């Protein structure tokens, strides 16, 4: 099997169609055909027929996720942690590569459409729900089930299962499903930002699992918060434009944004909850704990100063007493 042929890697001068100087979609297509016999250019998302496109399969999968992690945590209560370091490294490395590849393919397609048709077309026009983008949306959706393994590693290592982590992982799979089903044209922005964050996040986990000291841990959460702010700007704009155009045309708007109202409201609600939860997590983890840590350090320094001062006072008193003794003896002799 030849995976290095010149016909696979087509080099171009950077342009609207090939912003990276390489035809990434062609490369992805050829690799997919040669490795797994699947042509992404022929993919068609059909609700109810495409794998994991039925409400029943999605609900069962997410329910199974919560059952597994809760029962798994209970099973591990009286057992020693299973670190699975190599497997954890591989998991994070794979997700870093997948996220980066999907992000590059997404940028290539969106950039082409943006340069030819403008920003509003990309955000709101139903024609921007292209076959290539739908394929990438679907592949991104499938990765959400792979990401559920994050929690499995947590309970195997007997790490605490925070509500934010479990809620976020389970609901994100449902969120991606509803947006595919609702054909929201704005979802490329949310997915692109999420993929960018995941490149940072999973590369951090990979490096940490390899024993590297990574200084930018806090920035993972900061970038996630920025991501949700930008997500909500896009989603609220799209939802408002759709409602104003369809139901309240007397309100100021710039045109219709395609997608179902259910998908729009569900997306706005979920992303809003993410923003509040991640801000709360950041405050509790880095600000409050940091303040307490500084207080403990200050208290430790104060204790050390007090001990040193007390020791100095005792030494001074002893020295004074020693120096005073001869004069006392002389006075008694006189």
Curated annotation (Swiss-Prot):
It is an enzyme of class 2 (transferase). GO terms for biological process: fatty acid elongation, monounsaturated fatty acid; fatty acid elongation, polyunsaturated fatty acid; fatty acid elongation, saturated fatty acid; nuclear membrane organization; sphingolipid biosynthetic process; very long-chain fatty acid biosynthetic process. GO terms for cellular component: endoplasmic reticulum; endoplasmic reticulum membrane; nuclear membrane. Residues 1-51, 108-135, 182-187, 246-260 are lumenal. It comes from Schizosaccharomyces pombe (strain 972 / ATCC 24843) (Fission yeast). Its EC number is 2.3.1.199. It comes from the Eukaryota. InterPro entries: ELO_fam. The keyword Transferase applies. The keyword Endoplasmic reticulum applies. It is found in: Endoplasmic reticulum membrane. This is Putative fatty acid elongase 1. The modification Phosphoserine is found at residue 325. May be involved in the synthesis of very long chain fatty acids.
């Amino acid at each position: 099997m030849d995976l290095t042929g010149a016909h696979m890697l087509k080099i171009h001068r950077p342009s609207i169609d090939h912003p990276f100087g390489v035809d990434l979609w062609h490369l992805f297509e050829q690799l997919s055909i040669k490795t797994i016999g699947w042509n992404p250019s022929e993919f068609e998302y059909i609700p109810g027929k495409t794998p994991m496109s039925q409400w029943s399969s999605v609900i069962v999968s997410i329910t199974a996720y919560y059952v597994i992690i809760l029962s798994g945590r209970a099973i591990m209560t009286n057992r020693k942690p299973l670190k699975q370091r190599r497997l954890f490294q591989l998991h994070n490395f794979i997700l870093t590569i997948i996220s980066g590849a999907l992000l590059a393919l997404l940028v290539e397609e969106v950039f082409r459409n943006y340069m030819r048709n403008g920003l509003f077309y990309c955000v709101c026009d139903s024609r921007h729900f292209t076959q290539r983008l739908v394929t990438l949306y679907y592949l991104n959706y499938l990765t959400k089930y792979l990401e559920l393994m994050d929690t499995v590693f947590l309970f195997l290592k007997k790490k605490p299962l925070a509500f934010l982590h479990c809620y976020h992982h389970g609901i994100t799979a449902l969120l991606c499903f509803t947006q595919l089903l609702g054909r929201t044209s704005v979802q490329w922005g949310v997915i692109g930002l999420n993929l960018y964050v995941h490149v940072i996040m999973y590369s951090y986990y990979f490096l940490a699992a390899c024993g590297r000291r990574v200084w930018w841990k806090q920035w993972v959460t900061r970038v996630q918060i920025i991501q949700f702010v930008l997500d909500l700007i896009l989603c609220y704009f799209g939802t408002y434009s759709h409602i104003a155009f369809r139901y309240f045309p007397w309100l100021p708007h710039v045109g219709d944004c395609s997608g179902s109202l259910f998908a729009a409201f569900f997306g706005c609600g979920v992303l809003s909850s993410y923003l509040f939860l991640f801000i709360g997590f950041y405050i509790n983890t880095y600000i409050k704990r940091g303040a307490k840590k500084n207080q403990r350090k200050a208290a430790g320094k104060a204790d050390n100063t007090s001990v040193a001062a007390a020791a100095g006072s005792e030494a001074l008193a002893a020295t004074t007493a020693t120096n005073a003794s001869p004069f006392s003896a002389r006075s008694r002799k006189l």
